[in-house]
Amino acid sequence: MTYFVLFLGLCFVLGSLAVASNPSPYYGVVGLVLASIAGCGWLLSLGVSFVSLVLFMVYLGGMLVVFVYSVSLAADPFPEAWGDWGVVGYGVGFVAVLMVGLIVGGFVGSLDFGVATVDSVGMFSVRLNFSGVAMFYSCGVGMFLVAGWGLLLTLFVVLELVRGLSRGAIRAV
């Protein structure tokens, strides 16, 4: 199980790297799907299945819509590939930042934060999964509204960034 969780963590980092250094929106979708599946699987391994399911639906339901719009509006005749020097430079830079973070985190890692697991106190403990459901629907209404507005803002930002110098979705008619 430990190796599987480490594999999910590696897939999450590689998917995030693929989203951060994507040469065209086509490849960004692949990185986003890989990172969201790995991150939600990581949460699932901690026992927080409802939060994992909600995040998976938000990522794939909300953000893939943004990428579909951007792919349809930024139809490049010759998109850059992963092997281009600019993309490789971004990848090497991000891996260098990750390594520096791991080295610094190794020195700071002696603080021993830890993770609370499910059912650690016996029959009388409340699972993190079910308390999360109650918090989502009682105190989390404002955060759902903020997340919805954030996704709408992200849609417009990506549509503006994708259009570049050519025509885009938001243009003067």
Swiss-Prot record:
Keywords: Electron transport, Membrane, Mitochondrion, NAD, Respiratory chain, Translocase, Transmembrane, Transmembrane helix, Transport, Ubiquinone. The keyword Mitochondrion applies. The keyword ATP-binding does not apply. It catalyses: a ubiquinone + NADH + 5 H(+)(in) = a ubiquinol + NAD(+) + 4 H(+)(out). Pfam families: Oxidored_q3 (PF00499). It is found in: Mitochondrion membrane. One of its GO terms (cellular component) is mitochondrial membrane. It is a multi-pass membrane protein. InterPro entries: ComplexI_Subunit6, NADH_UbQ/plastoQ_OxRdtase_su6, Nuo/plastoQ_OxRdtase_6_NuoJ. GO terms for molecular function: NADH dehydrogenase (ubiquinone) activity. Its EC number is 7.1.1.2. Its main location: mitochondrion. The chain crosses the membrane at residues 1-21, 27-47, 48-68, 87-107, 139-159. It is an enzyme of class 7 (translocase). Belongs to the complex I subunit 6 family. Core subunit of the mitochondrial membrane respiratory chain NADH dehydrogenase (Complex I) that is believed to belong to the minimal assembly required for catalysis. Complex I functions in the transfer of electrons from NADH to the respiratory chain. The immediate electron acceptor for the enzyme is believed to be ubiquinone. This is NADH-ubiquinone oxidoreductase chain 6. It comes from Aethia cristatella.
